[in-house]
Amino acid sequence: MTLTERLREKISQAFYNHGLLCASYPIPIILFTGLCILACCYPLLKLPLPGTGPVEFSTPVKDYSPPPVDSDHKQGEPSEQPEWYVGAPVAYIQQIFVKSSVSPWHKNLLAVDVFRLPLSRAFQLVEEIRNHVLRDSSGTKSLEEVCLQVTDLLPGLRKLRNLLPEHGCLLLSPGNFWQNDWERFHADPDIIGTIHQHEPKTLQTSATLKDLLFGVPGKYSGVSLYTRKRTVSYTITLVFQRYHAKFLSSLRARLMLLHPSPNCSLRAENLVHVHFKEEIGIAELIPLVTTYIILFAYIYFSTRKIDMVKSKWGLALAAVVTVLSSLLMSVGLCTLFGLTPTLNGGEIFPYLVVVIGLENVLVLTKSVVSTPVDLEVKLRIAQGLSSESWSIMKNVATELGIILIGYFTLVPAIQEFCLFAVVGLVSDFFLQMFFFTTVLSIDIRRMELADLNKRLPPESCLPSAKPVGRPARYERQLAVRPAMPHTITLQPSSFRNLRLPKRLRVIYFLARTRLAQRLIMAGTVVWIGILVYTDPAGLRTYLAAQVTEQSPLGEGSLGPMPVPSGVLPASRPDPAFSIFPPDAPKLPENQTVPGELPEHAAPAEGVHDSRAPEVTWGPEDEELWRRLSFRHWPTLFNYYNITLAKRYISLLPVIPVTLRLNPQEALEGRQPQDGRSAWAPPESLPAGLWEAGPKGPGGTQAHGDITLYKVAALGLAAGIVLVLLLLCLYRVLCPRNYGQPGGGAGRRRRGELPCDDYGYAPPETEIVPLVLRGHLMDIECLASDGMLLVSCCLAGQVCVWDAQTGDCLTRIPRPGSRRDSCGGGAFETQENWERLSDGGKTSPEEPGESPPLRHRPRGPPQPALFGDQPDLTCLIDTNFSVQLPPEPTQPEPRHRAGCGRARDSGYDFSRLVQRVYQEEGLAAVRMPALRPPSPGSPLPQASQEDGAAPEKGSPPLAWAPSTAGSIWSLELQGNLIVVGRSSGRLEVWDAIEGVLCCSNDEVSSGITALVFLDRRIVAARLNGSLDFFSLETHTSLSPLQFRGTPGRGSSPSSSVYSSSNTVACHLTHTVPCAHQKPITALRAAAGRLVTGSQDHTLRVFRLEDSCCLFTLQGHSGAITTVYIDQTMVLASGGQDGAICLWDVLTGSRVSHTFAHRGDVTSLTCTTSCVISSGLDDLINIWDRSTGIKLYSIQQDLGCGASLGVISDNLLVTGGQGCVSFWDLNYGDLLQTVYLGKNSEAQPARQILVLDNAAIVCNFGSELSLVYVPSVLEKLD
């Protein structure tokens, strides 16, 4: 067993056990799932409800003044200002954005030195801001006069009293953690602990105290022991009550003068006004709510077609709850991890969750309802999950692989989308496995088996398409009707689509192909590829710079890499470069401080990194507040009992401050315990975690090497994952038996396929067929040309029927018996007995005359067989107590007297019958059929009207052994019947008159097969030879001649051995040794004749000149059946159970397939399928172009060869007293038609499809004429 098979088995077993668990304990699992949903949705309280997010409006800073309170616009005048933009805001927010770094980085610096010195400068900056005073002609303005004065905090915030300002200006900075006391900060040995002591015990959330004081999200601050960034970012937040433009301008100018930012190009042009809503905006909810309503309606109306579901609306509601809970859990978990769903991917994310969740619901529902309904509920759930386990895990693994690749693209938008997608997939998988599966088990448990049996026939566990309205007679017959005659073996679902209601076909198509998920995955891959190709992060440029700087020629041997000025402008660097660590070396164009270049070029002894981490500014720094939680400002003002509902605040342009700190200052500002505490890097960790990179030439650390190696490692990992993904897609799309015939699908009974595997039960009807009776023994040969039907039984009797009405037109008796029309039920050979009793008198008898010896008047009409016989009921002995002496007897013959074969010995009834004949006034009768004549005794001759002329060598009467031989083959065209006998005799009969037109008995070898095509007759013989005959006739072979009904008792006027004046048969060609053994199959089409023999070969002849074109070898057994059509497609089947397809034009074998366990008994083709049957009573349908088996139909015993093709997409098969119609394209059972009680015990041995959409079924000695139901004609 391979690794894949073992893994698949373990996954299947795990899902099976999980299904048992969910179905066994549904209530506890639903309660547990509900608690998990509530726990994961708890962080949603920190998010705005849909439609309640803040709304923004921007105005220029220049000439800004607060809008008036009564700002009424003229009626009809368009206004760009929103309605809420009236009056002064609650407050003006001014953020001083500080970026600081210690440079150059020394080798003996600790990790705590990254943020201790930058944070200590916050106290100095706060002091500078508080001491700033504006002096102008109007006087002086200080911060206390323009800032927002706050009072006490809310009573419930006692733990924050020493951290947030009270009774003064609302000014926030990281120094608030230490009450703005530098000494307290300097004495703190655990800065990280102090910052995080007020954080929640769970994962970091938005709008925490750290975010309020730092003014930036925690991951952007750089305050961490394990960060690779050496830049610390924070803001000093000032809240003003009134807008004073001069004070703000002077404050900005002073800070930028004291702490310049040369490479900063942040724009200070606009104020952003943010309005906070109070009520839910219904308009924003309409699209999403409409989507979920449509989802509910679609699932509900679709599940109405699934009868295996008890509560349709309950299942639809459970599906909607599953999808909605998955969405809420995803957003809640993202919020818990600090991800605020504000990007474009987050906006489209609810709709992606709907699509993916809908498909997973459909997959589980389809899998569970397709399990056998007679199993216990928990076993059905377990089997359903187990059957889809591998598919579910493959899809989840594929999606996670794509997400992993996307995360390593280093593009922020893709990374954030991938994080959302991971959380969404995990939450959706959890809910599908626990919540929806459990709800489905509860629903199916309600669908009790007793409730099903009320609507289902006993022989199948399928819901009836029309459960009501059955007549009482139909219900009674259900108890005695045999089981379903078919067992259908279906290939994997990729090869077929069942004919279902359109809703279910759409649902199961989505569930089977997972189209939406695959389209989403493909779209994600394309999106990631486009972003990587366009290189928004500048990765290729960065790598090129790294390769240039790492050249073995040294840094001085190569000049700076020429980059066009439009690519990396010095004044406004590309914002995408902000994703690189600040310590990564930049191109010379970005280094705008020329005074530092000589210092960097000559590294000093003991310096760890010669380059200072460049502090860069980008446009994203202008509105850093957007990365904060939307509750950031409402939370801050709520602490002081100030509400922002239905009000707005104004955010002033950010003031950038850059701090470049000396390493010596970092060493001087270090706390004494820092060297002995956990700040020092442990020896067990690699130096690369703390240091920038390995040492380069000259003792320096080449940090670029680590980055280059990291990118190479990520690229290698992404390549490996991509290869594995392609392999998985190949295994998913290409089955294991791709290109190989047949499949490994196990054969199952119909009871194991509830509702035909997809909730659809084919209808069952019962009709009274047109029964054609008249044969005494089993019918062996059938032939038809569309208008006439010819049948021959083992007794040698040939009957001609009208295929339209079912009337018997004439009978051709076995030689020696009198031919009669079809008014009676058997040959009237009794007249021969009467003539024998009259001493061999051969007087002619006119048609319609009664026998001359009939004297007794008859009572009620009796059957024609006993119409001229006395009443023998008095001879019946009902005294069964008397023991008669035993006499040697033999079994009674199955046929009536005079129908062909005489008995050698038996009981002599003449002693009993002779007395009755004498009483009736009839002469003594000899019983020649019961007393065989002695050899050499002369036999009385019948008249010429009896069909046998009194010539020498004429055949004996019916009770004597026939020298003409039995009929082995039969063909019909027009009004001519060609008969091939075992004696080698070829006969041509008139189908209407029953007259022998011509015959040929030159060869004594029996005729095993015949072809009658375009006035050419080809006879295949037992000795392997072929005879080609040409038929000449002066009359048309048009079927219009059949309209007249011949008169009864008409007989030929000439001898059976003489040729007719209108029809002549001439032997044109003979192939004496066409095969070495008897020919068993013969077909002709498109000017070609194909023969199959027991010598394992086929031969192709040209029909016009009997020239042998090809000898085809490919079977390992005798050929049993051959098919050829006008398109020159040749198929053959043999005793080896194989089917071969051949190219008639070249003689080459196209395909070879082992189809049956035994002989192939029948073979036919359509434009797209090859249909075969065998002695194993199995009907196989194969794809004609690929040779792959589509499905199999298991027939009843003895019905294996009973099949017929009505059209290219309609197949009819026979069973025990019924015929079934199948859709060849889809492989589903369309309808089963029962042929009444008389045929229930008889298997349909042979089916012949006529041109008028009628079907002739051979039930032994009777034929049933069935017309195709109208519903099938519509489908066709």
From Swiss-Prot:
Transmembrane segments annotated in the record for this chain: 19-39, 280-300, 313-333, 345-365, 402-422, 424-444, 519-539, 709-729
Covalent link location (Glycyl lysine isopeptide (Lys-Gly) (interchain with G-Cter in ubiquitin)): K454, K466
Mutagenesis or variant effect for Y298C: Loss of sterol-dependent ER retention due to loss of interaction with INSIG. Constitutive interaction with COPII coat and maturation of SREBF
GO biological process: cellular response to sterol; cholesterol metabolic process; COPII-coated vesicle cargo loading; protein import into nucleus; regulation of cholesterol biosynthetic process; SREBP signaling pathway
Modified residues (Omega-N-methylarginine): R1048
ER export signal, short sequence motif: residues: 447-452
Effect on the protein upon substituting D428 to A/N/K: Loss of release from ER retention and maturation of SREBF. Constitutive interaction with INSIG
Membrane-topology annotation of the record: Multi-pass membrane protein
UniProt WD repeat ranges: 771-811, 949-999, 1002-1039, 1074-1111, 1114-1152, 1155-1192, 1194-1232
GO MF terms, alphabetically ordered: sterol binding
UniProt-annotated stretches for the region Interaction with SREBF2: 731-1276
Topological region Cytoplasmic: 1-18, 301-312, 366-401, 445-518, 730-1276
Mutant phenotype after disruption: CHO cells show loss of site-1 cleavage of SREBF1/SREBP1 and SREBF2/SREBP2, reduced synthesis of cholesterol, a reduced level of LDLR and cholesterol auxotrophy.
Lumenal topological domain residue ranges: 40-279, 334-344, 423, 540-708
Annotated glycan sites: N263, N590, N641
Spans annotated as Loop-7: 535-710
Modification after translation: Ubiquitinated at Lys-454 and Lys-466. RNF145 triggers ubiquitination of SCAP, likely inhibiting SCAP-SREBP complex transport to the Golgi apparatus and the subsequent processing/maturation of SREBF2/SREBP2.
KW Protein biosynthesis (keyword) present: no
Keywords, in A-Z order: Cholesterol metabolism, Cytoplasmic vesicle, Endoplasmic reticulum, Glycoprotein, Golgi apparatus, Isopeptide bond, Lipid metabolism, Lipid-binding, Membrane, Methylation, Phosphoprotein, Repeat, Steroid metabolism, Sterol metabolism, Transmembrane, Transmembrane helix, Ubl conjugation, WD repeat
S-S bonds: none
Renumbered residue ranges of the record's region Disordered: 60-81, 816-903, 928-957
Locations listed in the record: Endoplasmic reticulum membrane; Golgi apparatus membrane; Cytoplasmic vesicle, COPII-coated vesicle membrane
Notes on the domains: Loop-1 binds to loop-7, enabling interaction with COPII-coated vesicles. When levels of cholesterol in the endoplasmic reticulum increase, Loop-1 binds to cholesterol instead, thereby disrupting direct binding between the two loops and preventing the SCAP-SREBP complex from exiting the endoplasmic reticulum.
Function: Escort protein required for cholesterol as well as lipid homeostasis. Regulates export of the SCAP-SREBP complex from the endoplasmic reticulum to the Golgi upon low cholesterol, thereby regulating the processing of sterol regulatory element-binding proteins (SREBPs) SREBF1/SREBP1 and SREBF2/SREBP2. At high sterol concentrations, formation of a ternary complex with INSIG (INSIG1 or INSIG2) leads to mask the ER export signal in SCAP, promoting retention of the complex in the endoplasmic reticulum.
Family: Belongs to the WD repeat SCAP family.
Protein name: Sterol regulatory element-binding protein cleavage-activating protein
Provenance organism: Cricetulus griseus
